[in-house]
Structure formats: structure tokens, C-alpha cells
From Swiss-Prot:
Signal peptide: none annotated. The chain crosses the membrane at residues 36-56, 266-286, 295-315. One of its GO terms (biological process) is ERAD pathway. This is Transmembrane and ubiquitin-like domain-containing protein 2. The lineage of its organism: Eukaryota, Metazoa, Chordata, Craniata, Vertebrata. Gene3D superfamilies: Phosphatidylinositol 3-kinase Catalytic Subunit, Chain A, domain 1 (3.10.20.90). It comes from the Eukaryota. Residues 174-247 form the Ubiquitin-like domain. InterPro entries: TMUB1/2, Ubiquitin-like_dom, Ubiquitin-like_domsf. Residues 104-120 have a biased composition (Basic and acidic residues). GO terms for cellular component: membrane.
């Protein structure tokens, strides 16, 4: 009896143990153990980290190379500018003539002095011939030109420049900056009693009808107004706008009458047709609602009434003013 009971217990335990063994034998990929999959995953993760580090390292080296190239380019430009500055200095300050030895004769002194003058004149001429070409190649416009010494060549005519420093105006005069749309400026000297029309005639002769002057966001339309009445003081900025030749500056009475040069509009205004079209659509929908009411549910009827009321208020608000 005991042996049979033990045998029955063993028979009842065997199916559970067999199921546990079957579950333990299940793998992610058939034919490949789970340990192999874990090792392969770890290797792939390490490779991904190494590749990410290498890519970051390469990007840093590339940026360093680019920074080095920019720095080297900046150094070369500084060297070129230094060379030009040296040439300009050589032109402005010619080399002094060597003093002859006191033991030499008077004839040798005269010859050496003549040769020294010729060499200095040749060097100054060579410097004057090289400088314009270098300025043309390097486009150096803001480089200050050094004046020659007292014994140099004949005086040159002064160049007129808008950006140069102007002399202080006489007492009673003010300086007004006329600024255009292309960010260029022109200095205008006027009296506070001068009018806007006089300012236009002085600095824009023949273009008074095309020029528009704007000060502090206000268009200066009245040519009889003085600068003092417009609170235009010294060093104020007036924006200038040049209109096309066909158009003129609108006067105070231009807004009362339509312009004669404005061409008539031949196109159809679509916005004005929206209200009639919507009225026709509402009329058609209401016609179908009255004659075929079986096709309209209660929510549809309520929505139609609401749209009609809203549209009526909108139309009365637009045309009832």
C-alpha cells in the first residue's frame, strides 16, 4: 500500500516538473541560447558607445581645424594691412639723405647730395605709384593718408567727403542730417527760420515735388512751416524718400478730392459679392426647408435659424452705420 501511494505521488509530480523543464528550455531565438543573446547584446552596446565617442571626437577635431584656418586667415590679413601701412608711411616720410663724411671734398658732397635727392624723389614717386593699386586691390577706403613733410611735392586739392567732419556752423545755424532709404546721410546747414520748401529747394533743386520729408514719424507736407515750428533743432535726423517721377507729394487738399492720375479699377471686387451670394444661399436653403421639411431634422432647423439671425445682425452692423 505504501509503495503504491508513493508511486501515485511520483506520477502526480512528474507533469509539473516536466512543464517547468519545458519553460526553462524556451529561448528567444530557436537554436540559440539565451546566454549567447545576452553576450551579443552587450557587445553591440559597447560598439555603439565606441562609435558615438569616435564621431564626437572627429567633430571636435574638425571644428578645431576650421578655427585654425580662420585664425590663420585673420593673421594673413593683418600682415597685408601692415605691409600697406608701411608703404604709406614710406610715401609720407621719405628717407633722409645720408650725411657725407667730413673728410670728403666739396665736389663729392655736391654729387652725393644730388644723388640723395634723386633717390628720395624716386622712392616717393614709387610709393605714390604703388599705393593707388594696392588701395584698388584691397579696397582700403578708411585708411587715413598721412600728409607729406614741409619740403614734399605741391599741395593737393582737398577731396570732398560726406563722412568727413564738418566745420562747426556759424551762430544761428543748425545742422540737419538728411537720411535716405539706403542708409546714406547728407548734412544740411539751415536756419531755424527756414521753411520746409526752402530746405527742399536748396538741397533737392528740381525735385521738390518728388521728395518726402519725414520727421519723427510725421510727414512734413506744408512747405510754409518753419523748422523752428516743427521743433527741428541741431543734429536732428529727417528721413527723405524720393517718389517716382510720375507721382507727386500729396498736399493737404489731396485727401479731399480723388487723384486725377489714378487709373480706374477694371477688376471686380470679390469681397462685395460675398454678401449677395450668401443671401441667395440662405434663401435656397429656406425654400427647401419649407417645401421639403421631411428632410430637415430639428437640430438642422435650429442651426439654420441661428445662422440666419447671426448673418442678419452682421449685415445690419456693416451697412447700418
Amino acid at each position: 500500500m505504501i509503495s503504491r501511494h508513493l508511486q501515485n505521488n511520483l506520477m502526480s509530480v512528474d507533469p509539473a516538473s516536466s512543464q517547468a523543464m519545458e519553460l526553462s528550455d524556451v529561448t528567444l531565438i530557436e537554436g540559440v541560447g539565451n546566454e549567447v543573446m545576452v553576450v551579443a547584446g552587450v557587445v553591440v552596446l559597447i560598439l555603439a558607445l565606441v562609435l558615438a565617442w569616435l564621431s564626437t571626437y572627429v567633430a571636435d577635431s574638425g571644428s578645431n581645424q576650421l578655427l585654425g584656418a580662420i585664425v590663420s586667415a585673420g593673421d594673413t590679413s593683418v600682415l597685408h594691412l601692415g605691409h600697406v601701412d608701411h608703404l604709406v608711411a614710406g610715401q609720407g616720410n621719405p628717407e633722409p639723405t645720408e650725411l657725407p663724411h667730413p673728410s670728403e671734398g666739396n665736389d663729392e658732397k655736391a654729387e652725393e647730395a644730388g644723388e640723395g635727392r634723386g633717390d628720395s624723389t624716386g622712392e616717393a614717386g614709387a610709393g605714390g605709384g604703388v599705393e593707388p593699386s594696392l588701395e584698388h586691390l584691397l579696397d582700403i577706403q578708411g585708411l587715413p593718408k598721412r600728409q607729406a613733410g614741409a619740403g614734399s611735392s605741391s599741395p593737393e586739392a582737398p577731396l570732398r567727403s560726406e563722412d568727413s567732419t564738418c566745420l562747426p556752423p556759424s551762430p544761428g545755424l543748425i545742422t540737419v542730417r538728411l537720411k535716405f532709404l539706403n542708409d546714406t546721410e547728407e548734412l544740411a546747414v539751415a536756419r531755424p527760420e527756414d521753411t520746409v520748401g526752402a530746405l527742399k529747394s536748396k538741397y533737392f533743386p528740381g525735385q521738390e515735388s518728388q521728395m518726402k520729408l519725414i520727421y519723427q514719424g510725421r510727414l512734413l507736407q506744408d512747405p510754409a512751416r518753419t523748422l523752428r515750428s516743427l521743433n527741428i533743432t541741431d543734429n536732428c535726423v529727417i528721413h527723405c524718400h524720393r517718389s517716382p517721377p510720375g507721382s507727386a507729394v500729396p498736399g493737404p487738399s489731396a485727401s479731399l478730392a480723388p487723384s486725377a492720375t489714378e487709373p480706374p479699377s477694371l477688376g471686380v471686387n470679390v469681397g462685395s459679392l460675398m454678401v449677395p451670394v450668401f443671401v441667395v444661399l440662405l434663401g435656397v436653403v429656406w425654400y427647401f426647408r419649407i417645401n421639403y421639411r421631411q428632410f430637415f431634422t430639428a437640430p438642422a432647423t435650429v442651426s439654420l435659424v441661428g445662422v440666419t439671425v447671426f448673418f442678419s445682425f452682421l449685415v445690419f452692423g456693416m451697412y447700418g452705420r
